[in-house]
Amino acid sequence: MSCSLHSAYLLQNPQYRLDVERRKDGSTIKPSWLKVKFPSSPLFHFTTEMVRDLQLNTVCEEARCPNRWECWSRGTATIMIAGKQCTRACKFCAVTTARPEPLKADEPQRVAEAAVRMGLRHIVITMVARDDLPDGAAGHVARTIQAVRQVCPDIVIEVLVSDFQGRLRDVETIVDAKPDIYNHNLETVRRLTPVVRHRATYDRSLMVLAHVKTVAPKMITKSGIMLGLGETGDEIRIALHDIRSVGCEIVTLGQYLQPSSQLLPVKSWVTPEEFDAWKQYAESIGFRYVASGPLVRSSYYADAVSISDLRVTSDLT
């Protein structure tokens, strides 16, 4: 069977996913490809100490990312700003839901210091949803971008931000700060969005991504979805087309992993072969960079993207 035929077969036969087996205590038994080694290196310890010293939050820790050990051993981390408590309670996310503390005015400078200490060429800045603030912390994100750019003028800055409840002026505040990559995740397919994402809508997320391209046509945009929540192949296909239709050049697809027993259970394990097939499909409909695999997360190996190539592509879209 040819590669393309094999991919089509996988996408049309979701029964080839693995059922989820559970232990007596209710915890899931993960397939072999999801078992992560815990590498330790001088860079891992350096990153750990630097994060503590600068009193920074990372999504690697707060969201219990399975790639933390690998990324920190490579000297990379995704910095989470605007606090460590989120105003939303999405059913896939391990970040604590609570009344957030006030923004810390010196946080942008601390993030910039982290970029300098780590010698980063690519930084990912993400945030908790701050629906308690009039601008959703958009101004704080913009100030962080500017602080990093001031000390690292050649760094690639990627932001992974909320939908700001659909307030396009706040989206424009981020755009005006000129990040290189504007990332906002769709997270899941349309049908599952009300269950998976608290106070978010499928169409609002697409509107945000479309607006970025409207006001900044050359800005690279990115989105991603999780698999294994009960979605169908047709729903994944539609979601990919929807993301591409609003101009996104980059898309990520990864396996949903249940962070705790209080969050949504995994419905199925998606095989590496199916992820490869989705990568081929996404590339076939025009995405310029696709990261698709069981352990892929939105910022996993974000620095592997060739920004110069994507900028040329953006000029043509």
Language-model features: locations:
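Auxiliary Fe-S-binding modules of radical SAM enzymes
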Residues: 1-78, 109-116, 143-154, 176, ...
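Local cysteine-cluster metal-coordination motifs and their immediate loop/turn environment
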Residues: 59-71, 82-97
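Short, surface-exposed acidic/glycine-rich loop or hinge patches that mediate macromolecular interfaces
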Residues: 84, 162-165, 230, 295
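Glycine/Thr-rich phosphate-binding loops of Rossmann-like dinucleotide-binding domains
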Residues: 89, 133, 192, 261, ...
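Core AdoMet radical
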Residues: 94-111, 117-169, 174-208, 222, ...
